[in-house]
Amino acid sequence: MNSNIIKSIDIIPNNNNNNNNSVSTVNTNSSVINNNNNNNYNNNSISNGNNERIKVFIVHGHNNIVREKVSKFLFEMGFEPILLFEKPNNGQTIIEKLEKEISNCKFGIVIMSPDNKAFTKKDSNSDYVEIAYPRLNVVFEFGYLIGKFGRSNVIYLSVPYNGKSQNYDLPSDLLGYVWINYTEDLKELENEINFGNYKKL
C-alpha cells in the first residue's frame, strides 16, 4: 500500500432515533462536511508528507453545479479542494486573499465556462456576432496559476457551450493551451490526475 495514503475521515453518527433520514458528519483534517447516507466519500487522502491532504486551488465562474461536482470529486480522490469564496476574509483585499490561498496549494484546476456574452466582429467590414466568454476574473486567475505553478501543474477544464468544448472567446495567448473536456463522469479529469504527477507534488 502506498505510504502516502492515510485515513483521515471519522464518521460521527446522528443519534436522533426519531429521524429516519439520519445525517452523518464527516470530520476531515481541515473542514467539516455534512454527508447524507447516499454519498460515500473515499476515506483515503493524498498526503504531502505531513499527514495533510494535497491542496488544489479551483478557479471557477458562475456554473455552481460544475464547481461543486469538481470539488466533491477531488475530495473523493483524496485531495483538499480550495474554493476562494469559502475562506474567511480576515480584512484582506480580494487579491491578498487570492495570493494567500494559492500559496498553500500545489496545483490548480481552472473551470472555464461560458458565463458571459458579448457582441464582436472580426474586422471593420464584418457584422457583429454574439459570442460567449468566461468571466474575466477566471481568465486572470488562470494566468496567475500558470505563473505560480507552471503550465504543467494547471489543468484547464473546458465546459461545453452549445454542445462544443471551448466554443467561446479567449485571449489569443491561451488558444494553444491543451484543455480537457468536462463530462458528467469527469473521466478525462480523473485520467489527467492519475497519469500526471499531481499526486506526488
Swiss-Prot record:
Lineage, broadest ranks: Eukaryota, Amoebozoa, Evosea, Eumycetozoa, Dictyostelia
Pfam families the UniProt entry points to: CAP12-PCTIR_TIR (PF10137)
Molecular-function GO term, any one: NADP+ nucleosidase activity
Single GO BP term: signal transduction
SUPFAM superfamilies: Toll/Interleukin receptor TIR domain
Induction: Up-regulated by phagocytic stimuli.
Annotated gene: tirC
Organism of provenance: Dictyostelium discoideum (Social amoeba)
Protein name (record): Protein tirC
TM regions (residue ranges): none
Domain of life (superkingdom): Eukaryota
InterPro entries in UniProt: CAP12/PCTIR_TIR_dom (IPR019302), TIR_dom (IPR000157), Toll_tir_struct_dom_sf (IPR035897)
Ranges for domain TIR: 52-186
